[in-house]
């Protein structure tokens, strides 16, 4: 089997993005553009992967880690100069070398494999991946002769009027014989309008040496989309989102309105789950089978087991076990764990708390820094008061306890199994097994107090 290598171009500053963030680290559906590219390159089982870094090199290296080797382009002298920086790492490598830009997040591994196969079938020294662009403005044009053989690639600024009318464009992806690539790069000059060392000049050098140069035209132009502006980033995100949603639907997920549903690339969703419009599912979220995610819910880095129902709520970095439900208008903050068959109603906030099976927290409640057992009823308006102004404190509530409405639980306290807290209580001490705690002022009625009012209210 022929050895395969890859070079990912990620050294550019991306000035048109007008951003402090390195261009290739801008995200498309939850992953940086260069991460998308690297993931697809990895899927083609490369022997060597080298990423060319320059602007923001440390940030790119931190983002990609040890999944790739790195070569640094200290001066931005063109694409040919950039590739040449990988020579020290690949000079002894045989076989084929793929070159792809780190700002093209929509390429698929299958396309790279097709390019490799075509390159080998043609016995080529270099093969260009091309596409037909509806609007080729800004792209390098692929110039062919009457027999359809590639003559050259000409950049937009160097193209004649006739050449600018060509719609077949260079996608910026190439497959080269590795040894011939670096030999040709040493012959590239910067005698052009930009004063740069163009990688595309390698094509003409190879042709002049009598080597075969081929061009493989891909069908899907969107896949070759490069991102240089915020508008292009939005367009790439739209295409990627359509692709992600289509894959989930193919796997048995019902997405009511795919055009109004945002799902990150790392999300996993089980079959027969229904997702309503306006939903955002982000990060490394996993959703089980037969779930319902209601309209306008936002979910980040969650584990949601089977048959969970989420209604118009915000969930982040927590776990919901099977057959539980939440919402509308509730919030799971980080490190919450919700047991099976739990009911969390409207306007409930849970933070760094564990709630046991079959417990019900109906509405207007804050549960923070607490462990609640099984079969507990938490009434309306209950607050777990966890902060003393300096430190957070923990509360434990045992199985089958009952907490009446409008109660304040002042941590740290222990509320035992089968205990009862009367409505309106402020609990500052432990509540023992089978006890009822009442911590409120006794009601006093004042007879005939109405007549003592300074004046009689109108309409009474």
UniProtKB/Swiss-Prot annotation:
Pathway: Nucleotide-sugar biosynthesis; UDP-N-acetyl-alpha-D-glucosamine biosynthesis; N-acetyl-alpha-D-glucosamine 1-phosphate from alpha-D-glucosamine 6-phosphate (route II): step 2/2; Nucleotide-sugar biosynthesis; UDP-N-acetyl-alpha-D-glucosamine biosynthesis; UDP-N-acetyl-alpha-D-glucosamine from N-acetyl-alpha-D-glucosamine 1-phosphate: step 1/1; Bacterial outer membrane biogenesis; LPS lipid A biosynthesis. Its main location: cytoplasm. Keywords: Acyltransferase, Cell shape, Cell wall biogenesis/degradation, Cytoplasm, Magnesium, Metal-binding, Multifunctional enzyme, Nucleotidyltransferase, Peptidoglycan synthesis, Repeat, Transferase. GO terms for biological process: cell morphogenesis; cell wall organization; lipid A biosynthetic process; peptidoglycan biosynthetic process; regulation of cell shape; UDP-N-acetylglucosamine biosynthetic process. Its cofactor is Mg(2+). GO terms for cellular component: cytoplasm; membrane. Mg(2+) binds at residues 103, 228. Residues 252-460 are annotated as: N-acetyltransferase. GO terms for molecular function: glucosamine-1-phosphate N-acetyltransferase activity; magnesium ion binding; UDP-N-acetylglucosamine diphosphorylase activity. Residues 231-251 are annotated as: Linker. It is found in: Cytoplasm. It catalyses: alpha-D-glucosamine 1-phosphate + acetyl-CoA = N-acetyl-alpha-D-glucosamine 1-phosphate + CoA + H(+); N-acetyl-alpha-D-glucosamine 1-phosphate + UTP + H(+) = UDP-N-acetyl-alpha-D-glucosamine + diphosphate. Signal peptide: none annotated. InterPro entries: Bifunctional_GlmU (IPR005882), GlmU-like (IPR050065), GlmU_C_LbH (IPR038009), Hexapep (IPR001451), Hexapep_transf_CS (IPR018357), NTP_transferase_dom (IPR005835), Nucleotide-diphossugar_trans (IPR029044), Trimer_LpxA-like_sf (IPR011004). UDP-N-acetyl-alpha-D-glucosamine binds at residues 23, 73, 78-79, 101-103, 140, 155, 170, 228, 333, 351, 366, 377. In the N-terminal section; belongs to the N-acetylglucosamine-1-phosphate uridyltransferase family. Catalyzes the last two sequential reactions in the de novo biosynthetic pathway for UDP-N-acetylglucosamine (UDP-GlcNAc). The C-terminal domain catalyzes the transfer of acetyl group from acetyl coenzyme A to glucosamine-1-phosphate (GlcN-1-P) to produce N-acetylglucosamine-1-phosphate (GlcNAc-1-P), which is converted into UDP-GlcNAc by the transfer of uridine 5-monophosphate (from uridine 5-triphosphate), a reaction catalyzed by the N-terminal domain. This is Bifunctional protein GlmU. It comes from Lactiplantibacillus plantarum (strain ATCC BAA-793 / NCIMB 8826 / WCFS1) (Lactobacillus plantarum). The lineage of its organism: Bacteria, Bacillati, Bacillota, Bacilli, Lactobacillales. The gene is glmU.
């Amino acid at each position: 089997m022929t050895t395969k290598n890859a070079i990912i171009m990620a050294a550019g500053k991306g000035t048109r993005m007008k951003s402090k963030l390195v261009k290739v680290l801008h995200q498309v559906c939850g992953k940086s553009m260069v991460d998308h590219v690297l993931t697809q390159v990895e899927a083609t089982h490369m022997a060597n992967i080298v990423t060319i870094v320059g602007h923001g090199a440390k940030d790119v290296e931190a983002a990609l880690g040890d999944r790739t080797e790195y070569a640094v382009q200290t001066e931005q002298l063109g694409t040919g100069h950039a590739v040449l920086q990988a020579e020290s790492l690949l000079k002894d490598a045989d076989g084929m070398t793929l070159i792809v830009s780190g700002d093209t997040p929509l390429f698929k591994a299958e396309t790279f494999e097709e390019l490799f196969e075509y390159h080998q079938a043609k016995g080529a020294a270099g093969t260009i991946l091309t596409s037909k662009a509806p609007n080729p403005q800004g792209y390098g044009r692929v110039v062919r002769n009457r027999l359809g053989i590639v003559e050259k690639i000409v950049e937009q600024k160097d193209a004649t009027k006739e050449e600018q009318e060509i719609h077949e464009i260079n996608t910026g992806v190439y497959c080269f014989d590795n040894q011939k690539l670096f030999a040709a790069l040493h012959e590239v000059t910067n005698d052009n309008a930009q004063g740069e060392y163009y990688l595309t000049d390698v094509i003409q050098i190879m042709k002049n040496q009598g080597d075969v140069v081929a061009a493989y035209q891909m069908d899907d132009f969107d896949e070759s989309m490069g991102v240089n502006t915020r508008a292009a980033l939005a367009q790439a995100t739209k295409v990627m989102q359509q692709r992600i949603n289509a894959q989930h639907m193919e796997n048995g997920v019902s997405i009511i309105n795919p055009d109004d549903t945002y799902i990150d690339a790392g999300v996993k969703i089980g079959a027969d789950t229904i997702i309503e419009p306006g939903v955002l599912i982000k990060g490394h979220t996993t959703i089980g089978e037969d779930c319902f995610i209601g309209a306008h819910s936002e979910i980040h880095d969650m584990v949601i087991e089977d048959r969970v129902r989420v209604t118009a709520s915000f969930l982040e970095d927590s776990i919901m076990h099977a057959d539980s439900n939440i919402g509308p208008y509730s919030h799971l903050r980080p490190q919450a764990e919700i047991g099976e068959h739990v009911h969390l109603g409207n306007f409930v906030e849970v933070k760094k708390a564990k709630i046991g099976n079959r417990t019900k927290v109906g509405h207007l409640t804050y549960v923070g820094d607490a462990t609640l057992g099984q079969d507990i009823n938490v009434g309306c308006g209950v607050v777990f008061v966890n902060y003393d102004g300096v430190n957070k404190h923990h509360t434990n509530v045992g199985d089958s306890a009952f907490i009446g409405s409008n109660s304040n639980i002042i941590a740290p306290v222990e509320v035992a199994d089968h205990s009862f807290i009367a409505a309106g209580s402020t609990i500052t001490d432990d509540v023992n097994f089978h006890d009822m705690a009442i911590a409120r002022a006794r009601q006093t009625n004042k007879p005939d107090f109405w007549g003592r009012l300074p004046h009689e209210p109108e309409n009474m």
